[in-house]
Each structure stands twice: as C-alpha cells, then as structure tokens.
C-alpha cells in the first residue's frame, strides 16, 4: 500500500452562497475574471483592484466592464462594481493595468490633483473585429475615469493584440509596455514618454505554447539574502497549458529598458493547481510591501459552470514575491520564485491549536472545531523516515455528507498533492481534474532525514497550498453543494514514517479596522 500525508476538509450542507471566500476577493454579484489595474494609493494608504466584470450575468459576456474594489490590507475588500465601460453593448473593456503618473508625463492632470493620485488606465478595447489599446484617466483617485479623446493610442491591426501591462522604468526615464500578440506567441515591448505615443522596442518569444499567450507582466523582483534583483516575465497560457486549460508561466532574466533577456531557456510554472490564471502585480506598491500580486482563481475549462449563485469566480489571496536559489534535484540549484500569502491586519485567529513532536500513528493529532467562519489555515513541518513503514496518512477531516477536499504528501512518490475528487460540484465535468501535484526537494535535512513544510489556507471554495516557504504552490477551487465553511479541521497521523515536528491550525476571521 502506498503511503501519503493528507489533509482532508469536509463540510456541512447549508446554502450555496455561503461558499463565498472570506479573504479572497469576490464580486458582490455577476461574473468576474482577470485582475486588472492593481495599484497602491500612497496618499490614502489604499490598495485598488480592478477586474474583468459582467454585472448582467454570471457568465462571461458583453458589454464587459472593469469592476473596482479597494482594501486597506489586501484581506478585507469593498466592492464598487462597474467603473470603466465600453461605448457599445457589443464591445468590451478587456484586460490592462493602471499606473500612477506622479510627474504628469501624460499631461492629463493639473496641480489640483495630488501626484500620488494621478491615475492612468491602459487597457485593450475589444470589438468584434479589432483589439486596440486605449487610455483613460481619473481625477478622483481611481473611482471614475475620463477616456482619452484621441484613443486608440496603439493599433497594430491585429485582432489578437491585448492585455497591456505598463510600468515606469527609472534607468531609461520612460514608460514600458509589455503586451501579447496572443496567437503569435509573442510578447511585444514598447516604450513611451507620455503614455499616449508608443514605439516598439523588441519582441520576446519562448516558453510553453498552448493555444495562445495572454496577460503578460514584467517586474523587478528582489533576490532573498542579497542586495540583488532580477527581472521576471509572467505569461498566461490558455487553453492548452500543460496542467490543462489555463495556467501561468514565468521567466527570470535581465531587462535594460528595451529588451528582456532570460537567464536560461526554461519556462517555470507559477502554480501547479488548476485555478491560478492571469497573474498581475500592483503598481506603486510601498517598498516595505515588496512585489505584491494576485491571480484569478479559476480555469477557462469550467469557469462558466462553477456552481455558485449570485456571483462567479474569486481572486487568489494576495501574494508577496521574492526570488531565491533552490534545489530542483540533488545536483541542480536554480533561481526560482517564492510566493507567500499576505494576511492583512484584519485577519485574526478565532481559534488556534498547536502541537509538536507527534510521532508515528496518532489518529487525532490535532483537532479544531468551527467557532465562527469555518475558514482555516494549517501549518505543518514534518520529516519522513523511509526506513520505516510508510503506510498511512496525515489528514484533516470535517463535517457530514461524506464529501471532502484533500491536500497532502505521499512519501513513496515524494510529492505533494491536492485531491478534490470527493466533491460533487462539477464532478461530471471532464476538465475539473480530481488531482494536482507538485514535486519539491526537501526544505532541509535534520538528523539525516528530509524535512518538508506545508502551509495552506481554505477560504470558502478555495484552497491554496504553499510548499517549503512557497517554492511551489497548488491553488484549486472545490464545490461542495450548500457548504457553510468547514465544520472542523483535524490533522491525523497514521504513518510510522512521518514525524510531525510542529503543527498549527487556526480558524480565521475578519475584524473591523480603521
């Protein structure tokens, strides 16, 4: 019998609406997909998130808007609904981003607008026969927008030319745009001094193909433990990713303001789950926050069918990004992305249990009952002794009705997994893959035994698992009809080979903040 370390989450049957995540953003109603236009307002100390939004239905369709939400801490959100809309009902405001034009390079602002709130949106305007790049600007800090009267600002006569990501490049004193020529598998890099006149600098090609590229990003990311940084190019693939449907890849390299050059020929996956797409970072993030971004927590293979009620789709939790050198195997160490979930000051523990040094078969190592929200986190450090009988599990169990979501580790294969095969929502959909997995080298060795770390969050119908400090992640949605959050969370150890060094489980809730 193969042994594995598993976490299982079961839930009571209540009402569909209660499966809404607590911390990950969801629209109040309607359809949502890609995150757009994230930026930080340093005057009001406020994070802004925009998103692809259809307020008229819970499936994708036109007219397509940008929705808008804000947060003080990236965990508690206020939704404002539709913000930028198309000129005609058959058109759409497709993905793009927002920059803070502190120095008024665009000329859109006068001195009455605080430099910290000179907000400019750059987005794809989609019609039946064209995709062109448009600009709009806000005179109230990002709540309402005026469209630039001379739109479009960029048109290459291609119907698959979309998803601009713009940022200020200080060394060359210019704005940079990365944008996808989607079905040519090409990321174009443009430059501008005023956000309205753009010149092509170079093209980047490479990586996993799939059907098309979307939602690129380019940002400088610090390398942990050094004073150095590297540039990271993010590219979304849909459909046809190696994980099935939608996913994100990234490349690490250098950027001189004109050309991105990867350090190697390897395309790295950002997440090994099924529900992580269109990742984007926040512009103007405070230095102490580092590089912050989030993704759409869904997959185009089944996004329109997710069994929620008045709303459909969520974002992931916000994540902080760094780079670190880590082993891919015993012989090769490479620079890789580390992702760590962000919990704002509004997130507190309603309940918490910690235990250490759990050895061998302990079938109720840790158990925590739902007290308020049924939103849980778990943090486990464990070692594996391959000389012992590896049969058994480490698992977390809850509820009635026999449905479950599992996450865990198989010591025989040396891999982590998430298993949503015992959930009935979308069970008949052939693309709602039961199991996803990730391989990572041990976090460290102690007493000649491999040691691993697994941190996870179960938030409504979303599970996000972070392995070995975020060197690999697994993000998956799951749908148990009528869930009202997890009823309890239990860690079990039934394997002689697994020694739990330390464990902590929390029930999380949100408190009011000023």
UniProtKB/Swiss-Prot annotation:
Reactions that this protein is recorded to catalyse: Hydrolysis of terminal, non-reducing (2->1)- and (2->6)-linked beta-D-fructofuranose residues in fructans
UniProt: substrate binding residues: 33-34, 52, 60, 95, 162-163, 214, 300
Glycosylation sites: 56, 104, 110, 197, 203, 357, 371, 389, 422
Family: Belongs to the glycosyl hydrolase 32 family.
N-terminal signal peptide: 1-18
One Pfam family, short name: Glyco_hydro_32N
Temperature dependence: Optimum temperature is 60 degrees Celsius.
Induction notes from the record: Expression is up-regulated by inulin and maltose, and repressed by glucose. Ammonium sulfate, ammonium chloride and urea are inhibitory for inulinase synthesis, presumably because of the release of ammonium ions.
GO cellular component: extracellular region; fungal-type vacuole
Keyword RNA-binding part of the UniProt annotation: no
Alphabetically ordered keywords of this record: Carbohydrate metabolism, Glycoprotein, Glycosidase, Hydrolase, Polysaccharide degradation, Secreted, Signal
Active site feature: 34, 214
EC code: 3.2.1.80
A biological process from GO: raffinose catabolic process
Primary localization: secreted
Name of the protein this chain belongs to: Extracellular exo-inulinase
């Amino acid at each position: 019998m193969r042994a594995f370390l598993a976490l299982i989450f079961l839930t009571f049957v209540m009402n569909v609406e209660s499966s809404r995540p607590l911390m990950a953003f969801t629209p109040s109603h309607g359809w949502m997909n890609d995150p757009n236009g994230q930026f930080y307002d340093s005057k009001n100390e406020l994070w802004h998130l925009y998103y692809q939004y259809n307020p008229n239905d819970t499936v994708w369709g036109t007219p397509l808007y940008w929705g808008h939400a804000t947060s003080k801490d990236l965990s508690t959100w206020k939704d404002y609904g539709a913000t930028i809309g198309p000129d005609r009902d058959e058109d759409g405001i497709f993905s793009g981003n927002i920059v803070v034009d502190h120095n008024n390079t665009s000329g859109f602002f006068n001195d009455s607008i605080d430099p910290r709130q000179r907000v400019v949106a750059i987005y794809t305007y989609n019609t039946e026969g064209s995709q062109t790049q448009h600009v709009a600007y806000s005179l109230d800090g990002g709540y309402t927008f005026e469209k630039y009267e001379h739109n479009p600002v960029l048109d290459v006569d291609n119907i698959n030319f979309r998803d601009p990501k713009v940022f200020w490049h200080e060394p060359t004193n210019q704005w940079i745009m990365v944008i996808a020529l989607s079905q040519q598998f090409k990321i174009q890099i443009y430059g501008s001094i005023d956000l309205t006149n753009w010149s092509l600098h170079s093209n980047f090609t490479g990586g996993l193909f799939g059907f098309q590229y979307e939602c690129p990003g380019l940002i400088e990311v610090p390398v942990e433990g050094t004073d150095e940084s590297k540039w990271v190019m993010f590219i979304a693939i849909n459909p046809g990713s190696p994980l099935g449907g939608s996913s994100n890849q990234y490349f690490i390299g250098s950027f001189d303001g004109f050309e991105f050059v990867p350090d190697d020929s390897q395309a790295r996956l950002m997440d090994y789950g099924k529900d992580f797409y269109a990742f984007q970072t926040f512009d103007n993030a405070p230095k102490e926050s580092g590089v912050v971004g989030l993704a759409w927590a869904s997959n185009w293979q089944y996004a329109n069918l997710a069994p929620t009620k008045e709303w459909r789709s969520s974002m992931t939790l916000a994540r902080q990004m760094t780079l670190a050198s880590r082993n891919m195997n015993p012989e090769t160490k490479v620079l890789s992305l580390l992702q760590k979930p962000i919990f704002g000051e509004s997130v507190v523990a309603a309940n918490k249990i910690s235990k250490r040094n759990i050895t061998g078969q302990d079938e109720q190592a840790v158990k925590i009952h739902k007290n308020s929200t049924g939103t849980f986190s778990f943090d486990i450090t464990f070692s594996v002794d391959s000389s012992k009988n590896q049969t058994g599990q480490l698992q977390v169990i809850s509820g009635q009705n026999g449905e479950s979501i599992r996450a865990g580790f198989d010591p025989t294969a040396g891999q982590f997994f998430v298993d949503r095969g015992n959930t009935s929502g979308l069970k008949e959909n052939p693309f709602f893959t039961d199991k996803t997995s990730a391989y990572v080298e041990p976090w460290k060795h102690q007493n000649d035994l491999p040691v691993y770390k697994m941190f996870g969050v179960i938030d409504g119908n979303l599970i996000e698992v972070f392995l070995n400090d975020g060197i690999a992640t697994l993000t998956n949605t799951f749908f148990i009809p009528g869930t009202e959050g997890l009823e309890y969370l239990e860690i079990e150890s039934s394997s002689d080979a697994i020694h739990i060094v330390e464990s902590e489980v929390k029930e999380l809730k949100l408190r009011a903040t000023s």
